[in-house]
Amino acid sequence: MYYALVGYGVSNKALCEKLISMGHKIFVSELRKFTDEEKEWFSKKGIDFEEGKNSDRICEADRIVVSPSVRFDHPALAKCRGKTFSDIEVVLDMNKPNFVIAVTGSNGKTTSCKLLSFVFQKLGLDSYACGNIGTPAADVLGFKTKYLVLEISSFQLFWSKMLHIDIGVVLNIQPNHLDWHPSLEHYAKSKLKLLEFSKTGIYNCSDQNIMKFISEKSNLCAFDPLKIRKVDDGIVYEGKYYTFKNDFLKTHQNLQNLSAILKIFSVMNFDLKQVLEILEDFKPLKHRMEFVDEINGVVFLNDSKATSSAATISALENFNSRNVILLLAGRGKNEDYADLIAQIKRKAKHVIVFGEMVELLRDELKLSDIPYTISENMQNAVLKAFEISEKGDVVLLSPAGASFDMYRNYQERGEHFINMVKLLRGKLLE
């Protein structure tokens, strides 16, 4: 079969390597310039390519696999929309596992997929997690697994026509990626396609945006984050008490994730008590409400993964008193920040802003009378936060914006924050 790959990012690069090894004809179309190493590899493998443009030549292929980053209204693709596919769609069509669980949502996707995989592994069940989680879906090609856990983005769902999913889960829908999607409705309907693709669709019935745009189907099953709450040594889920001592999973966002996970395992007829016993050993993920250090009674938390206002709102929900010094930064996604400003007024004592976020929030912060400081960079922000802090305060990096204004990704941003906190501790010891 003849494949055109539009965009040569992580997912399509992995797919290209698999497809060429299977004997398929490949044409790669990419707006950026290829490196000499990439061109050499293309030549060695007999792969035709174009760079600096996406021409009509892509329409000559039998299948056009669109990278998640390629815009939905790309003019070259409008002429051959009937041939467009996502990488996940191609992978599932070629490699049919026994059972596929797919997860999407504005927040909590990666953690939820990690929780599912963790339980399967601890039970000795053959499983594999891939997709938007960091491991390309194409990596699963060539071997069978009993349980395939997929993290799927709104972009991948938009480009997908049909996915064969056993259980599909929509965790939540909050305004996000509105620099790509033209409206919240467009974004929400892309997410909700997952329920249409699934034998059993699980959705958050407490999420207003899901309930606004969802279509009633007989295959749907609801989970309700309002029916789970933490108690001192456990949780109460759907009216039943369970011993559970993992404090990381008892934070605001993770209780929502846990509610979805328990609904999945309930649908699969797993013993929920056993599932929770396993999850007590689950360790926190990097850059998600990650404890960094405590210096002179001031706690530093790294939540660099919070790349939208909804994620930062959720992070702030973990604090009951206004003892948070919040670091905001990054590139906006065409969001309305009114809800974020309201949450900051309730939860934070001071805001420090740097990067492109300064121009987005300066006027709103000024009008809201929230104490704020504009900083040049991460190092100055950390130093200023500690300077104005008091014992018992929390310095929280939860940026509410994408990292690409100053960093390659949210991981690099989070590591920079960690290093600046280490530098601060070192200076205090001098």
From Swiss-Prot:
Reaction(s) the record says it catalyses: UDP-N-acetyl-alpha-D-muramoyl-L-alanine + D-glutamate + ATP = UDP-N-acetyl-alpha-D-muramoyl-L-alanyl-D-glutamate + ADP + phosphate + H(+)
Enzyme Commission numbers on file: 6.3.2.9
Residues annotated as binding ATP: 105-111
InterPro entries listed in its UniProt record: Mur-like_cat_sf, Mur_ligase_C, Mur_ligase_C_dom_sf, Mur_ligase_cen, MurD
Compartments (UniProt record): Cytoplasm
Pathway given in the UniProt record: Cell wall biogenesis; peptidoglycan biosynthesis
MF term (GO), any: UDP-N-acetylmuramoylalanine-D-glutamate ligase activity
Keywords noted in UniProt: ATP-binding, Cell cycle, Cell division, Cell shape, Cell wall biogenesis/degradation, Cytoplasm, Ligase, Nucleotide-binding, Peptidoglycan synthesis
GO biological process, one term: cell wall organization
UniProt superkingdom: Bacteria
Gene Ontology CC annotations of this record: cytoplasm
Record SUPFAM superfamilies: MurCD N-terminal domain, MurD-like peptide ligases, catalytic domain, MurD-like peptide ligases, peptide-binding domain
Function: Cell wall formation. Catalyzes the addition of glutamate to the nucleotide precursor UDP-N-acetylmuramoyl-L-alanine (UMA).
Family: Belongs to the MurCDEF family.
Protein name: UDP-N-acetylmuramoylalanine--D-glutamate ligase
Species annotation: Pseudothermotoga lettingae (strain ATCC BAA-301 / DSM 14385 / NBRC 107922 / TMO) (Thermotoga lettingae)
Taxonomic lineage: Bacteria, Thermotogati, Thermotogota, Thermotogae, Thermotogales
Gene name per UniProt: murD
